[in-house]
């Protein structure tokens, strides 16, 4: 979700995540990551990484996962993908970035 890593939550972005889920016939896992200034970057990325790894551990194929986000959430999705690549972890099928 957007919010400059300071504000926002999955609840504030429920309308768009619900719309995307319905239009794409997909499930959405919206991460309620830790926010700044109490938890500066990379705390949010670490939270997103933990969720991504939990999805893989639960049996979700990375080929069927898409990272998406708007504003700070777009940056978070992109930085997570770069961290996955740097760590040699399975990459998602794609990225959907709105104003990263």
Regions found by a protein language model. Give the residues of each.
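Domain-scale detector for complete catalytic domains at protein termini or as standalone homologs
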Residues: 1-100
């Amino acid at each position: 979700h957007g919010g400059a890593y300071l504000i926002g939550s999955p609840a504030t972005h429920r309308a768009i995540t619900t719309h995307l889920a319905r239009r794409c016939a997909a499930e959405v896992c919206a991460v309620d990551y830790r926010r700044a200034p109490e938890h500066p970057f990379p705390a949010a990325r670490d939270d997103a990484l933990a969720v991504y790894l939990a999805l893989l551990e639960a049996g979700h194929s990375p080929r069927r996962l898409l990272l998406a986000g708007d504003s700070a959430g777009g940056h978070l999705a992109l930085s997570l993908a770069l961290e996955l690549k740097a760590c040699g972890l399975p990459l998602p099928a794609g990225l959907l970035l709105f104003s990263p």
